[in-house]
């Protein structure tokens, strides 16, 4: 659990635009697999499970990381509120598996390519949270529904 917590705090830092190693600014770059064909398995074109991925690069030190596009959203207050409302503490979880399941099992829908716009929908119990993002993966709309 200690390793998961450290990694999650690094992701929260990156999603907030701060390098978890030196505190400098992080540059965030969105990548979209245009030939994405994954449905439950990794895509043969990009190797990912989702079409949208993100790369993080420190502007000061050698730190870089990346992964699923949703990583850029993990510090969003609406998503954090959604997690805690459903009994999941993203910093000190009772169940790492439950938090991972909620954060990483989401629906992704690309609404437009130019300008880029996509939706990420998270589910917990009988409720959904849909975050709409722009080309910088900044949240431009947030909708919770039962």
Descriptions of predicted regions:
Residues 11, 21-23, 47-48, 93-99:
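Short glycine-rich, low-complexity/disordered patches
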Residues 2, 33-50, 58-59, 73-88:
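Short cysteine/histidine-rich metal-coordination sites, predominantly Zn2+-binding motifs
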Residues 26-33, 67-73:
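Short Cys/His-rich "knuckle" micro-motifs
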Residues 64-146:
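Long, contiguous alpha-helical scaffold regions
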Residues 5-16, 27, 31, 46-52:
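Short, flexible, mixed-charge glycine/proline-rich loop motifs
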Residues 19-25, 46, 59-62:
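Short Cys/His-rich metal-coordination motifs, predominantly Zn2+-binding knuckles/fingers
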Residues 15-20, 41, 54-56:
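Cys/His-enriched microdomains
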Residues 1-3, 8, 146:
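Long, charged N-terminal interaction/targeting segments
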């Amino acid at each position: 659990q200690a390793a998961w917590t450290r990694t999650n705090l690094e992701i929260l830092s990156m999603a907030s635009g701060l390098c978890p190693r030196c505190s400098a600014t992080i540059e965030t770059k969105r990548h979209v697999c245009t030939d994405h064909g994954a449905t439950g398995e990794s895509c043969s074109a990009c190797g990912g499970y989702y079409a949208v991925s993100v790369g993080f690069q420190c502007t000061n030190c050698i730190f870089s990381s990346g992964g699923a596009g949703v990583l850029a959203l993990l510090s969003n207050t609406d998503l954090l509120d959604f997690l805690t409302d459903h009994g999941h503490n993203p910093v000190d979880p009772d169940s790492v598996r439950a938090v991972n399941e909620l954060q990483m099992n989401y629906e992704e829908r690309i609404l437009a390519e130019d300008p880029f716009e996509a939706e990420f929908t998270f589910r917990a119990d009988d409720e959904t949270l849909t975050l709409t993002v722009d080309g910088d993966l900044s949240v431009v709309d947030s909708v919770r529904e039962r």
